[in-house]
């Protein structure tokens, strides 16, 4: 397998045969010549055992140039240096020099610019530029760096996401601006827990400076709704500001509902190993219900006031249902302009109200499921047939189930009984604004859908019917555990 390479006699770079075969040299192993074949080829032991061809190559002359050759190369480079073209004035500066020379000619300068000779170098053939060695001098870096900085510091191409620092504010109208959030939405009030307040508070009242919960408060004696809102719909009223705040607050509130729902779903409340429900966050659920009811009442109050022309309060569910059924006939919806009538709540805000109610129903369903599972783990007993527990004097977002008052020999059952009453009272206040099962908001959305797509309201199914079944199931378990 050994083959000698034929080269001219005077310029052959090959020398003597190597002492190790190519295979051993590649694997960096010791090569031991075993025998010499009849044709003159040498074979090593490893190649014989591996039954592979064994080839011994020849050494090559060193490629390192001698001192004489180095001197000759340096003199050759010096002699050919004047014939090379300097790439610095040819490649980098022509764009700038061409601009300057053009401007001077435009201004009518009599003396030609010295950069014209440089700009004429642009006409040099590409072969001349290709012969030049690449140069990485400072002007090359400074030119490109300057060009990059000018692009970065400039206005640049238009972007669909404006920069608040350059647009001069305007972030107040953005839904992602959280500066308008209030830290305290009066969640400590008991307006939704007292039946007398629920019956006496006209939900259509509101002020421009009041909190969202002021939507449920009664007017002062002798006051009327005409002092705080306009029935015409053409003039500026406090409702426009209130609806704007409600429309901006609803997405954040729905996000809080989703976070609370995920936190309760991932908790240990459904496991048999849960020792106690004392730390169950009942106050957070109550706060979400109360705040959502206030915001929903404001949004639907705007729709009723400006859409129907009659100033129907949101608590008048029958009036809102009639207006929603009439639809475009009462001026409530004008789909040609993409929303409700001018001055009323937008279609997107009404959809947010319905979406928030969906999350609230899911949240209540999960809480009732936790109560049901916890009551199943408690042995049945008797509390004497009566419960004398009252709600806590104050309710806060941090209220826990263990902080509720308890009575009798079964404190867990009595606390769940009190918590269920508070939750149902809060849900009742929400349904006073939205109707039973969110019927008012659904009728408004259905009216939009039927006008836009021709759907029949009878074909839309109610997806919240199982919530009443869960309430009845928990009540039956409470009666069973209490021995009633």
Curated annotation (Swiss-Prot):
Residue segments, region Disordered: 59-117, 136-174, 202-242, 386-406
The keyword Transcription belongs to this UniProt entry's keyword annotation: yes
Biased composition (Low complexity): 77-107, 202-213
Keywords: DNA-binding, Metal-binding, Nucleus, Transcription, Transcription regulation, Zinc
Superkingdom as given in the UniProt entry: Eukaryota
Main localisation: nucleus
Any GO MF annotation of the entry: DNA binding
Ranges of compositional bias, category Basic and acidic residues: 64-76
Metal-binding keyword on record: yes
One GO CC term, this protein: nucleus
CDD domains: GAL4
Subcellular compartments: Nucleus
DNA-binding region(s), residue ranges: 21-54
Disulfide bonds: none
Physiological role: Transcription factor that regulates the expression of the gene cluster that mediates the biosynthesis of the tetramic acid Sch210972, a potential anti-HIV fungal natural product that contains a decalin core.
UniProt protein name: Transcription factor cghD
Organism, scientific name: Chaetomium globosum (strain ATCC 6205 / CBS 148.51 / DSM 1962 / NBRC 6347 / NRRL 1970) (Soil fungus)
């Amino acid at each position: 397998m050994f083959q000698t390479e034929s080269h001219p006699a005077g310029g052959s770079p090959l020398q003597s045969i190597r002492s190790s075969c190519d295979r051993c040299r590649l694997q960096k192993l010791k090569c031991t010549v075993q025998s010499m074949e009849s044709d003159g080829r040498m074979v090593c032991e490893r190649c014989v055992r591996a039954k592979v061809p064994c080839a011994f190559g020849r050494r090559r002359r060193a490629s390192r140039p001698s001192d004489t050759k180095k001197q000759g190369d340096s003199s050759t480079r010096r002699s050919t240096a004047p014939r090379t073209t300097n790439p610095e004035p040819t490649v980098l500066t022509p764009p700038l020099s061409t601009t300057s020379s053009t401007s001077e000619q435009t201004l009518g300068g009599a003396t030609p610019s010295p950069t014209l000779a440089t700009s004429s170098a642009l006409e040099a053939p590409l072969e001349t530029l290709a012969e030049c060695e690449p140069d990485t001098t400072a002007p090359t870096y400074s030119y490109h760096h300057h060009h990059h900085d000018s692009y970065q510091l400039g206005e640049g191409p238009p972007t669909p996401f404006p920069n608040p620092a350059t647009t001069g504010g305007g972030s107040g109208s953005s839904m992602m601006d959280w500066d308008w959030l209030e830290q305290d939405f009066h969640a400590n009030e008991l307006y939704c827990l007292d039946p007398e307040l629920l019956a006496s508070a006209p939900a259509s009242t509101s002020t421009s400076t009041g909190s969202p919960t002021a939507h449920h408060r009664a007017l002062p004696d002798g006051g009327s709704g005409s002092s705080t809102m306009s029935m015409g719909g053409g003039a500026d009223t406090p409702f426009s500001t209130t609806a704007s705040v409600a429309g901006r607050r609803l997405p954040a509130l729905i996000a809080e509902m989703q976070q609370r729902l995920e936190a309760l779903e991932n908790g240990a409340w459904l496991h048999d190993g849960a020792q106690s429900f004392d730390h169950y966050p009942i106050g957070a659920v109550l706060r979400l219900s109360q705040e959502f009811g206030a915001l929903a009442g404001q949004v639907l109050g705007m729709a009723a006031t400006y859409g129907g022309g009659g100033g129907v309060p949101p608590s008048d569910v029958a009036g809102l249902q009639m207006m929603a059924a009439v639809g475009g006939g009462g001026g409530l919806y004008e789909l040609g302009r993409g929303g409700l009538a001018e001055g009323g709540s937008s279609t997107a805000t009404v959809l947010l109200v319905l979406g928030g109610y969906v999350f609230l129903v899911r949240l209540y369903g999960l809480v009732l499921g936790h109560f049901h599972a916890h009551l199943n783990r408690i042995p049945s007993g008797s509390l004497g047939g009566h419960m004398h527990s009252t709600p806590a004097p104050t309710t806060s977002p941090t209220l826990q189930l263990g902080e509720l008052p308890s009575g009798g020999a079964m404190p867990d059952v009595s606390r769940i009984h009190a918590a269920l009453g508070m939750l149902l009272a809060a849900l009742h206040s929400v349904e006073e604004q939205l109707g039973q099962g969110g019927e008012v908001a659904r009728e408004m959305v259905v009216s939009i859908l039927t006008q836009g797509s021709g759907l029949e309201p009878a074909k839309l199914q109610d997806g919240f019917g199982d919530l009443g079944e869960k309430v009845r199931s928990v009540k039956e378990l409470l009666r069973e555990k209490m021995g009633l």
